[in-house]
Amino acid sequence: MRHTLALAVAAVTCLAAPVGAQEADLTVVPPVPADYRPKTTSWGEPDFRGGWPIDHLNGRTPLQRDPAHGNRAFLTEAEFAQRAETVEQLARRYETEDSQGTMGIGHWAEVAAANRRTSWIVSPANGRLPEFTAEGKRLSGEMRSTWRRGQPFDTWLDFDSWDRCITRGLPASMFPFMYNNGMRIFQSPGLVALQMEMVHETRLIPTDGSAPVPRQIRNWLGESRGRWENGNTLVVETTNFRPGPSATNIGTTGSPPANDTPVSSEAKLVETFTMTGPDSIVYDFTWSDPTIFTAPWSARLDWVRDDEFQIFEYACHEGNVQIRNYITASRAERAQERESSQ
């Protein structure tokens, strides 16, 4: 049932390729439509309130583009058909569990319909993350995570912020994941709140011209300041990031193979949320971190309204036992290795 809904949603979203995709220039990313004017709140600001889950984007579009696609932002018809078949095979797990009266990974990992995007990254033109600086490589090598193969665990410092159910960080939290893709926007005079289902975080974004906080005050999700432009766009600038979380997350298809993309104190995120229709938002962002990357990089995702989407509590690892279990198991494994080598 949910898969059927995803098929319908995907048909009208995901930065669709122009009509006649085979003849069109598949390297061109269309400009964001700018003529729609949403209704306003009672205090006169554009009204973005509602549910904006990104489940429909979880259809095998990777963060980074396959080098074989070059500078193409969209798939060819043949490539799209192949992706659609792959997604359909994944979705059948869901339907099989329904027919058998069981519930397992098929229900846990939500799969949407395929779309034509070759990557979420739109800049650089090759759709891939820029190279690390020398300092970025050094810091990446020092990061600790359960996603690093062969890494021992002796202390909580051997785990990343997502392992510890604290945060996926930014901009990683804004990309689709295999589950928990709920987003909801709340507004009050001078403030926008963006609730995220994953790790039940909420971003608070003042839009009242509040002065930035001192640079020495740093948070996992940084400090955001927003402003309204053109009657249909929320622009958000975020700085003051606390180093620690990875800027990319392995749970998003096509991300680096471990949560080891560092975030420095120089990182800056500039986002635009442009309402292009009563039920659509184009979400663009640019991430710049000159300490880590040799160049900024940008991504685009298309949001679709779903005010019926419900966000439930995400307990992550209830009882907070996961870290202890990892450490206990890691120490036991190493003890066995020492005994066997004697």
Tell me what each language-model feature is:
Residues 1-4:
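Positively charged n-region of N-terminal signal peptides that target proteins for export
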Residues 20-342:
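PEST-like low-complexity, intrinsically disordered acidic/proline/serine-rich tracts
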Residues 6-16:
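Bacterial N-terminal signal peptides
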